[in-house]
Curated annotation (Swiss-Prot):
GO terms for cellular component: plasma membrane. The lineage of its organism: Bacteria, Pseudomonadati, Pseudomonadota, Gammaproteobacteria, Enterobacterales. PANTHER family: ELECTRON TRANSPORT COMPLEX PROTEIN RNFE, ION-TRANSLOCATING OXIDOREDUCTASE COMPLEX SUBUNIT E. The gene is rsxE. This is Ion-translocating oxidoreductase complex subunit E. It is an enzyme of class 7 (translocase). Its main location: membrane. The chain crosses the membrane at residues 18-38, 39-59, 63-83, 86-106, 125-145, 182-202. It is found in: Cell inner membrane. GO terms for biological process: electron transport chain. It comes from the Bacteria.
């Protein structure tokens, strides 16, 4: 149970692929102009990570070490192609919005890295959990960044949610404030870099505060031989 908890905590927070490892920055910065796009690409990446880790782990005993990386890439490409066709079939609006960034998941360092570092050494179910946790950690970072950029840039949240969830999701759109001239800095790549930098700073402050709190609540160690001395 402790191993499962550690995998989840590492993926979601301590070893977050976007906020700690800083992997997959190209789609993170390019696609997160809206919360819907960020959530769509994040969930697609999570599905690819989970299925890839599961497959790599299941085949690890029959994968020659000398050619393991090309095999991993073939597995990842196959999974990404399947996910791309699913999005094209059931969320065509999102498919058009994400464009080239769906097939580019194949080259994402997160996917290859987890296959090599974890799935090739652990069992299928732990590997699938690792992929899911890492993917949800990345999805959370994308969603927060996309939400901030959409709110600051257009004054809305979940604009275009129907392209991801269907026509019923039009009711999710929220207009936080009305603007006739969008704040372009938030919508362009420089705004994405600034937003990511602020998120990194906030995570660092939270980690430092938690570390300080643990140090204050930890029982002080008594040196050997000091007990009973006046």
């Amino acid at each position: 149970m402790s191993e499962i908890k550690d995998i989840v905590v590492q993926g979601l927070w301590k070893n977050n692929s976007a906020l700690v490892q800083l992997l997959g920055l190209c789609p993170l910065l390019a696609v997160t102009s809206t919360a819907t796009n960020a959530l769509g690409l994040g969930l697609a990446t999570t599905l690819v990570l989970t299925l890839t880790n599961l497959t790599v782990s299941a085949l690890r005993r029959w994968t020659p070490a000398e050619i393991r990386i090309p095999i991993y890439v073939m597995i990842i490409a196959s999974v990404v192609s399947a996910v791309q066709m699913l999005i094209n079939a059931y969320a065509f609006g999102l498919y058009q919005s994400l464009g080239i960034f769906i097939p580019l998941i194949v080259t994402n360092c997160i996917v290859v890295g987890r296959a090599e570092a974890f799935a090739a050494k652990k069992g299928p179910w732990l590997s699938a959990l690792d992929g899911f946790s890492i993917g949800m950690g990345a999805t959370g970072a994308m969603f927060v960044l996309g939400s901030l950029r959409e709110i600051l840039g257009n004054g809305t949240l979940f604009d275009g949610a129907d392209s991801l969830l269907g026509s019923w999701a039009k009711v999710l759109r929220v207009e936080i404030f009305h603007t006739d001239s969008p704040f372009l800095l938030a919508m362009l790549p420089p705004g994405a870099f600034i937003g990511l930098g602020l998120m990194l700073a906030v995570k660092y402050l939270i980690d430092e505060k938690m570390k300080k709190r643990r140090a204050e609540t930890a029982p002080s160690a008594v040196p050997a031989g000091e007990t009973g001395k006046v």
